[in-house]
Regions:
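Catalytic, metal-anchored helix/loop core of enzyme active sites in primary metabolism
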Residues: 1-175
Length: 175
């Protein structure tokens, strides 16, 4: 739930979409859907949209990941379209949600930037849950890690683990 409060989840989804679909980040619009019913949407060249909707429950994507490519009977209630009434969408404010801005910077930076952003976020959230930093410090620390010059360039798998460790260490050193 904390990832949703900082919009780090949206930043990680952006990184994921850039990697999986080979799209530049500018082609991906991030919006906040407050009812948490619309989980993803794709707009095609004819401007039609296909969206994935469902009740807000992480058991759905976890179940699908475990049973792919089959769709098995769900363990969550059906989505009641009549009860929805309205779906609202807001532009994600990157000044308020610094984790999202940091993820965009990490993509542009390339190399291990996305790994550093993730490691920094996990460490900052841990420190927040331990009452060692304030909520707004999470975004500040993730941005500081991404803005540092430590995490660019080519890399190996062992570099990924080292980057994660160093990002967490950086966060602890910059409390």
């Amino acid at each position: 739930m904390l990832f949703r409060s900082t919009l780090m989840n949206k930043g990680l989804e952006l990184i994921e979409a850039v990697w999986l679909f080979g799209l530049p980040p500018e082609k991906i619009q991030i919006v906040v859907q407050r009812q948490s019913i619309v989980h993803s949407a794709v707009q095609f060249s004819d401007h039609s949209v296909i969206a994935q909707l469902g009740v807000p429950d992480m058991r759905i994507p976890i179940q699908y990941a475990l049973t792919y490519p089959k769709r098995v009977p769900g363990v969550v209630p059906e989505l009641d379209f009549a009860a929805l009434k309205v779906l609202t969408f807001d532009v994600a404010d990157e000044e308020t949600f610094r984790c999202l801005a940091a993820c965009k910077k990490a993509i542009k930076k390339g190399g291990l930037g996305p790994c550093a952003a993730n490691g920094a976020n996990e460490e900052a959230v841990k420190l927040f849950l331990e009452d060692k930093i304030g909520f707004l410090d999470i975004g500040r620390l993730v941005e500081a890690v991404v803005d540092s010059d430590r995490f660019g360039g080519d890399y190996t798998l062992s570099d990924v683990y080292e980057c994660d460790r160093m990002a967490r260490e950086f966060v602890r050193a910059h409390l």
